[in-house]
Amino acid sequence: MLSNCRQNTLGHNTQTSIAQDFSSEQGRTAPQDQKASIQIYPWMQRMNSHSGVGYGADRRRGRQIYSRYQTLELEKEFHFNRYLTRRRRIEIANALCLTERQIKIWFQNRRMKWKKESNLTSTLSGGGGGAAADSLGGKEEKREETEEEKQKE
């Protein structure tokens, strides 16, 4: 199962590897003199790259792009539970071919999006006084959910 996940997902340097594959294919078909005439301008070079020993090829990972299926499954899970237990996070990660860390961060981001959306709707419908009351209520709700999560584990 895990090997299928590895084969189906693309690495974090996908764009770089595609560009390298493309340039290697071009190199096979193009004559050597044409290859030497290609100029590399400063804007084509990687920014903040370190050539020293001990640095990885790319220190910062690119943005994770989730498939429609992965997004749908994550949204369904979020609809039922805004907080995951570690066991459930592992199950979802294996099912969707993602890491636990990716699942955790997706849920953190989704909770922030949900919070912003709920604050926006409450301020539009309730007026100015409702925002302070909502923020207090949100803290109590968060505490209750945290206690429920502890009981699940």
Curated annotation (Swiss-Prot):
Positions of the UniProt region annotated as Disordered: 1-34, 118-153
Alphabetized CDD domains for the sequence: homeodomain
Coiled coil: none
GO terms classed as biological process: anterior/posterior pattern specification
Molecular function GO labels: DNA-binding transcription factor activity, RNA polymerase II-specific; RNA polymerase II cis-regulatory region sequence-specific DNA binding
Segments carrying motif Antp-type hexapeptide: 40-45
Cell location: Nucleus
UniProt keywords, alphabetically: Developmental protein, DNA-binding, Homeobox, Nucleus, Transcription, Transcription regulation
Record-annotated DNA-binding residue ranges: 59-118
Entry superkingdom: Eukaryota
Ranges of biased composition (kind: Basic and acidic residues): 137-153
Family: Belongs to the Antp homeobox family.
Summary of the function given for this chain in its UniProt record: Sequence-specific transcription factor which is part of a developmental regulatory system that provides cells with specific positional identities on the anterior-posterior axis.
Protein name (Swiss-Prot/TrEMBL): Homeobox protein Hox-C6
